[in-house]
């Protein structure tokens, strides 16, 4: 009996020691994984408080297939030993091929996002993915991430538009996966026309456009569908996380960015303006954005069709995001980035495919069409920033201009003032000149007791090219200035004719200082009233073609 008891005690002791060792080993492994995750988060540069990373569960574990042989699909296009992994796709295909098509990724959303709830009757969407010679591993991972991380009821179909890839089976074999459909172009059409083709056959009321080298994150679709369901004129985009082109690490992007651009129509990510940051108390609220990157967004199909889809005369890729963004804002819609929606994207440093007319010429053609249709008089700044566009062919835009008129879209000036006031209008300075009426010239006439320059009319002296300082005016875009002071109306109301015109410290954003030439008139841009001479002062008055006091010569002409 003693022997049995001793053996039992020995067995229990060994079991306790082994159990303790296993517990400590597991605990240490969990802490190591957590530390590794936090390090990756900092590397991604996400400006949020530190928290434990969450690995996303798969909603569907292993996408059911109808005879789809994943191993055969991927192995058919694997790299040969010694082959450059960057050559064909401009990212490390070797690293992509190593990864599972169902790989887990980090939940990069703000910690408040999981607590949000969405409508139980969100509309289903057609996901449209266009590609040309995409790596099979990234294309498959894009498709499976959508199916694995989206409730099945929200995905009506995934439409793959194969833009004349070298191997038709890149697309066709994927149709063995449920909900996946394949359209193949019989010639190279480019992303823009391929997307239109996919949208035309889509059966859902909402369209979701994705690039072919993405991985969607947890609850990526629900917050975007919610915004579109609440207002069908919204076009919404996720925060676009970064998938490294070198090792395919999934890195969190900043939640404080929006889309912007310069006058050459070059897209850039920029910080949300400070005043918007100050009023932004809820990090889950959508961010207004002047433009979207264009690769990933959700739009109501009827709204997409109403707006005129894409400009089908644009070629291959580039510039279509500006054309769509201007059209949405100026024709009654809005653009948003939804912070609780995250999608990873492989950003490449070069295009892995050829443009029939070359990358630069294609981009010029597309952006020039955008400028000619949507930028009104501000298109001059596009040409100044991109002089290589001058004289380049861009096709007819008559139908696009007519469509804009039919939709009664707002002006580009409205867009700058209401959507993107942060885009500074370039100041185009010219040589000093005079503002002449008969034999008299507009001049500053000393200062008052407050130090303000006084305005009046005096006999012209000197010449237009070399006037005296008091009669020398600098004509810049919408500003008439002298010695750092600008001509300003005291009222911007059309109902206030007779308001005095004074000189103020120049402020390019001040509407009271905005003027334009209209024939021989100098017209106030905001009120529409005209500059007129009175015996003792200058005023703004209702424009009258027979009013000699409103007729001006600007020498030299700008």
Curated annotation (Swiss-Prot):
Residues in the signal sequence: none
Entry keywords, A to Z: Disulfide bond, Glycosyltransferase, Golgi apparatus, Lectin, Manganese, Membrane, Metal-binding, Signal-anchor, Transferase, Transmembrane, Transmembrane helix
MF-aspect GO terms: carbohydrate binding; metal ion binding; polypeptide N-acetylgalactosaminyltransferase activity
Record region (Disordered): 34-53
Family: Belongs to the glycosyltransferase 2 family. GalNAc-T subfamily.
Free-text tissue specificity from the UniProt record: In the CNS, it is predominantly expressed in several distinct hypothalamic, thalamic and amygdaloid nuclei. The most abundant level of expression is in the paraventricular, ventromedial and arcuate nuclei of the hypothalamus, the anterodorsal and parafascicular nuclei of the thalamus and the central, basomedial and medial nuclei of the amygdala. Also expressed in cerebral cortex, lateral septum, habenula and hippocampus.
Requisite cofactors: Mn(2+)
An example Gene Ontology CC term for this record: Golgi membrane
Binding site for substrate: 163, 188, 212, 317, 348, 351, 353
Catalytic activity entry: L-seryl-[protein] + UDP-N-acetyl-alpha-D-galactosamine = a 3-O-[N-acetyl-alpha-D-galactosaminyl]-L-seryl-[protein] + UDP + H(+); L-threonyl-[protein] + UDP-N-acetyl-alpha-D-galactosamine = a 3-O-[N-acetyl-alpha-D-galactosaminyl]-L-threonyl-[protein] + UDP + H(+)
Residue span(s) of domain Ricin B-type lectin: 428-555
Binding site for Mn(2+): 211, 213, 345
Region: Catalytic subdomain A, residue numbers: 122-227
Pathway entry: Protein modification; protein glycosylation
Membrane topology, from the record: Single-pass type II membrane protein
Annotated transmembrane regions: 7-26
Subcellular location field: Golgi apparatus membrane
Database matches in InterPro entries: GalNAc-T, Glyco_trans_2-like, Nucleotide-diphossugar_trans, Ricin_B-like_lectins, Ricin_B_lectin
Gene that encodes the chain: Galnt16
The protein's name: Polypeptide N-acetylgalactosaminyltransferase 16
